[in-house]
């Protein structure tokens, strides 16, 4: 009981670290005074990060079928393997990412896992502009981007910690529901980005069956 009421000993302007040290969202007084504000901030941040993660995770599906049109002589088996890798890596990674917020903290896990996605996105953007890029390089980059799918479990575990049981279902629903809109977002924007001449920013396009294609745009756009 003493630990549960520790928040009442906090000073007039406690730091975030001090509040988290005595986190008890089931206490109505704590929740109204400290918990609700911090939990809501985390929900906003986590949801937006999850949108970006789902964008990155699904992004390759909009590109894989275009490889043959931009000079890559991969077999159908190789292309389908590349298309499957993000799902395989993401699903496997969720087994481990569930524990990440507890190991390094929710804020750290959200920032690190989202920031890491910049590496494969930049890498794929460069690789797609060079038809001599090896298949093995694509396997590495596409597998790396698959960790975006694992971010889902870390995000849900993080949000679940901050909310009381009475609000947890709503918070997790917002996080997962809006986060999954990233899938729709990439399918909506990819066709636009593929045909949008942004060569001054992202490099030249290549001739495709329906005009110039700027496949790298799909990767680079989401890094900014």
Model-assigned labels for residue ranges:
Residues 115-132:
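C-terminal ends and interior cores of transmembrane alpha-helices
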Residues 120, 134-152:
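Hydrophobic core of transmembrane alpha-helices in multi-pass small-molecule transporters
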Residues 41-72, 186-190:
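Extracytoplasmic
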Residues 212-224:
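Symmetry-related core transmembrane helices of the 12-TM Major Facilitator Superfamily/SLC fold
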Residues 1-55:
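Cytosolic juxtamembrane N-terminal segment immediately preceding the first transmembrane helix
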Residues 149, 169-198:
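Glycine-rich segments within core transmembrane alpha-helices of 12-TM secondary carriers
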């Amino acid at each position: 009981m003493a630990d549960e009421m520790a928040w009442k000993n906090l000073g007039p302007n406690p730091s975030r670290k001090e509040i988290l040290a005595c986190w008890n969202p089931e206490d109505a007084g704590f929740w109204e005074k400290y918990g609700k504000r911090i939990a809501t901030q985390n929900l906003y941040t986590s949801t937006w990060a999850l949108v970006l993660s789902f964008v990155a995770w699904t992004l390759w599906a909009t590109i894989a079928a275009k490889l043959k049109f931009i000079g890559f002589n991969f077999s159908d088996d190789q292309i389908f393997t590349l298309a499957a890798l993000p799902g395989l890596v993401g699903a496997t990674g969720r087994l481990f990412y569930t524990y990440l917020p507890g190991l390094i903290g929710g804020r750290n896990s959200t920032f690190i896992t989202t920031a890491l996605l910049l590496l494969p996105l930049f890498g794929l953007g460069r690789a797609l502009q060079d038809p001599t890029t090896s298949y093995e390089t694509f396997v590495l980059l596409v597998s790396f981007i698959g960790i975006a799918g694992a971010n889902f479990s870390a995000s849900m575990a993080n949000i679940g910690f901050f909310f009381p049981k009475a609000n947890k279902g709503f918070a997790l629903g917002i996080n997962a529901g809006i986060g999954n809109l990233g899938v729709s977002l990439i399918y909506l924007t990819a066709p636009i980005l593929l045909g949008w001449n942004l060569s001054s920013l992202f490099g030249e396009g290549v001739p495709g069956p329906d005009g110039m294609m700027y496949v790298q745009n799909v990767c680079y756009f989401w890094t900014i």
